[in-house]
Design a protein with these regions (language model features):
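Conserved SAM-binding loop of SAM-dependent methyltransferases across substrates and taxa
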Residues: 185-196
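Substrate-binding/catalytic lobe of Class I Rossmann-like enzymes that use SAM or dcSAM, i.e.
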Residues: 279-391
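Conserved SAM-binding strand-loop segment of SAM-dependent methyltransferases
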Residues: 220-233
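A short glycine-rich, Lys/Arg-flanked "PGG" loop and its adjoining helix->strand segment in the class I
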Residues: 258-270
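Conserved class I S-adenosyl-L-methionine
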Residues: 175-182
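Feature captures hydrophobic
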Residues: 1-160, 165
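A short acidic, Gly/Pro-enriched loop at the edge of an enzyme's catalytic core
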Residues: 234-243
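Conserved beta-strand signature within the Rossmann-like core of class I S-adenosyl-L-methionine
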Residues: 271-279
């Protein structure tokens, strides 16, 4: 699993002896990994054993960064991360129960040479990667959200099924107006126009994505039915028969949830329906409690809990329907990773970025697999006097 632990590599790159404390703490963390049923030399190959102390100090941030820096490898990163996530807390507590162990851990963390004052320099940033990057590994409709895998086998089919499910849950009829908040590259909007005869307004704060929406709508002859705007949801005016927001509220911090639902209520017709799809957290928090994801993938992001969504919608909208598709996001992320693996050598991205993106997709897949993360779909109305029925 790892190289002999009597030698290490300092931050400067010069070889040197690892201290007694670091060796002891490193051995403890390695034992914790073994107790998570991670097979030495098979599930995980360690190239630099100095990372163990950093794992003890900075947790997931160090785990992700050490993978990015090639300090460890695995043929199945998703399985390694899933096993670590599934490890019972009691097992971890037993390893660190004695006062001597806790003292050694404290000393090792105090003198951790792997600590950084700032993030690794990944030149390519998540939302500045360009349309062609995402086009190379997403489905043909460029859906950057969870697909629906019931009865289907491919990513294209899963994303088509997801869009069909949204259309059915919205109970769309020809001529209805739809507001798509955070419309991405417009794939859902174009689908609702072609399949249901809807009139769609899509908003997005990304200029590049809006340009893509407009050009694609023109290319498909849908420009009269698809109106795309480069603006924030805060600037919305008007009313729509239906509102849809897929993978958008994750970028609205909890303190602004109330405002978001106030705006949705104002923009929704009295007899309208609103569909919301979001990644969800099991516990209410004000910020995304994951230092690696916050630093490298979703700065400023947050995952709402059911309680936070319900509280924000209270006295504004009525929750009519709820569904959890969490396990389907595991399948979606693994399909994305499979596609990404096929094209990564042609992307002309840095090695640090490639490994960051691989870890992002596989780490997130493990979270859904172990049910640490959820994928929720909500349907809301203003004041419908009929029972909502979806089959």
């Amino acid at each position: 699993m790892s190289k002999p632990m009597n030698k290490g590599v300092s931050r400067s790159g010069k070889p040197g002896k690892i201290s007694y404390v670091s060796r002891k703490v490193g051995a403890l963390i390695e034992e914790m990994v073994r107790q998570a049923d991670i097979v030495p030399g098979e599930d995980m190959i360690v190239h630099d054993s100095s990372m163990w102390v950093d794992w003890a100090d900075r947790g997931i941030l160090a785990i992700g960064e050490s993978y990015m820096e090639r300090k460890w490898d695995s043929p199945h990163v998703d399985q390694v991360m899933a096993k670590l996530a599934a490890m019972p807390s009691e097992k971890k507590r037993k390893l660190f129960r004695s006062w001597k162990t806790r003292l050694l851990l404290s000393i090792a963390i105090l003198f951790n040479q792997q600590r950084r004052a700032k993030e690794l320099e990944v030149v390519e940033k998540h939302y500045d990667l360009g349309n062609e990057f995402f086009r190379s590994w997403l489905d043909k409709n460029m859906q950057y959200s969870c697909g629906c895998w019931k009865g289907v086998a491919t990513l294209d089919e899963a994303q088509f099924a997801k869009m069909r499910m949204i259309g059915e849950k919205l109970k769309l009829k020809p001529g209805m107006t739809v507001l798509d908040i955070g419309c991405g590259w417009g794939g859902l909007g174009r689908f609702l126009i072609k399949e249901y005869g809807a009139k769609v307004t899509g908003i997005n704060i990304s200029k590049e994505q809006i340009r893509w929406c407009r050009n694609t709508a023109i290319a498909e002859g849908l420009q009269d039915s698809f109106h795309s705007l480069n603006q924030s949801y805060r600037d919305l005016e008007g009313k729509w028969d239906r509102i849809v927001a897929v993978g958008m509220i994750e970028h609205v911090v909890p303190k602004n949830y109330q405002e978001f639902f106030d705006i949705c209520k104002r923009c929704l017709a009295n007899d309208g329906l609103m569909f919301l799809q979001t990644i969800g957290a099991n516990i209410s928090k004000e910020v995304l409690n994951d230092r690696w994801l916050t630093r490298y993938i979703f700065p400023g992001g947050a995952l709402p809990s059911i309680a936070q969504i319900a509280k924000a919608a209270e006295k504004k909208l009525i929750m009519e329907d709820f569904q959890n598709l969490g396990p389907d996001y595991d399948k979606t992320l693994m399909a994305w990773h499979s596609n990404f693996t096929k094209v990564k050598d042609d992307l002309q991205m840095s090695d640090l970025f490639i490994r960051m993106w691989e870890f992002y997709l596989l780490y997130c897949a493990s979270g859904f697999r172990e049910r640490k993360s959820q994928l929720w779909q909500f349907v809301f109305t203003k004041r419908s006097k009929e029972c909502y029925d979806f089959e």
